[in-house]
UniProtKB/Swiss-Prot annotation:
Keywords: Cell cycle, Cell division, Cell membrane, Cell shape, Cell wall biogenesis/degradation, Glycosyltransferase, Membrane, Peptidoglycan synthesis, Transferase. This is UDP-N-acetylglucosamine--N-acetylmuramyl-(pentapeptide) pyrophosphoryl-undecaprenol N-acetylglucosamine transferase. Pathway: Cell wall biogenesis; peptidoglycan biosynthesis. GO terms for cellular component: plasma membrane. It comes from Ruminiclostridium cellulolyticum (strain ATCC 35319 / DSM 5812 / JCM 6584 / H10) (Clostridium cellulolyticum). The keyword rRNA-binding does not apply. GO terms for molecular function: UDP-N-acetyl-D-glucosamine:N-acetylmuramoyl-L-alanyl-D-glutamyl-meso-2,6-diaminopimelyl-D-alanyl-D-alanine-diphosphoundecaprenol 4-beta-N-acetylglucosaminlytransferase activity; undecaprenyldiphospho-muramoylpentapeptide beta-N-acetylglucosaminyltransferase activity. Coiled coil: none annotated.
Amino acid sequence: MKVLIAGGGTGGHINPGLAIAKYIKQKEAEADITFVGTKKGLETKLVPREGYPLETITVRGFKRKLSLDTLIAIKELIQSFFQASRLLKRIKPDVVIGTGGYVCGPVLYMAAKKGIPTLIHESNAFPGVTNRLLERYVSYVAISFKDAEKYFKNKKKLVLTGNPVREELLNSGRDKVASNLGIVEGKPLIVAMGGSRGARRINETIADMLNNYFKGEFNLIFATGEAQFDDISSTVKIDEKYRDMVKVVPYIYNVDQVYVASDLMICRAGAITISELQVMGIPSILIPSPYVTANHQEHNARSLERDGGAVVILENELNADLLYKQICSLIFNKDVLKKMSKNTSKNRVTDSAEKIYHLIKEII
């Protein structure tokens, strides 16, 4: 079976594709899987690391406001359909899967027009524009939240699968990996990250907290995002006796190990992040991005908060004092953390990749 997976831009679009690819390989070792993205997305790093070939086309989003940049983006979009057509002709996939990002538009559309079985996966409760446009052309739409149903017209194409997460998250043990991370024993581990691209407000707040409040109460792995790493890491000034407890990194590649060892997460509220927290049962302080369509991250965050698995801090309310006090109020109360962990896990889905695999086999 030849499989082409289109997805890119952020980890939230790429990691579900990697999870699907890994499951396919487990079921069919001889499966030939290729990814397609753009040259500017995180896929250029994540996909090769997992051993899959990556093809690229040129496409990006654009605003409706007329400008030179918009005209260039429209030109690239038109060209991307021809690039996608040539790619499909060369690879000859048996099925094409879209997991999000602008690259899905031309690739999935051209595949459907060529009669190739197609499937898109929508990770959010509020679907993106590209997936809503593709609905009429593809064979199936795999959705992760029941709330997403109302945004699609053809209900017969919808299948509730949940978000596929990496198998490593399901099969790891804390004791086995904690020592590999070099964390100080006897102290809880906090993991803070603002998504694959980083989040300026979160980064600056955590740097402020480390400089002015932190007294070695916990271990911290702080992922800034590659674009902001040099700037943020240079501002962090930690007392020498606490330096072994803090690791400032641009990106967490071994995130499965970090998840397993963590006691509390500080992060955005993207759909894939929420699903991974649920699978792992990790309590969290969620800071939803205010810069996303229809404010869908706050909806995600409030859902987990209602379940009792998370504390939500809006970005416009975020400051170092508030964050520090919230962290301490949780990590020094093990009963609260234990209850939050249980509440986080109660709506977890662990067989999403399997469900998507069965859809693939149905349409080819």
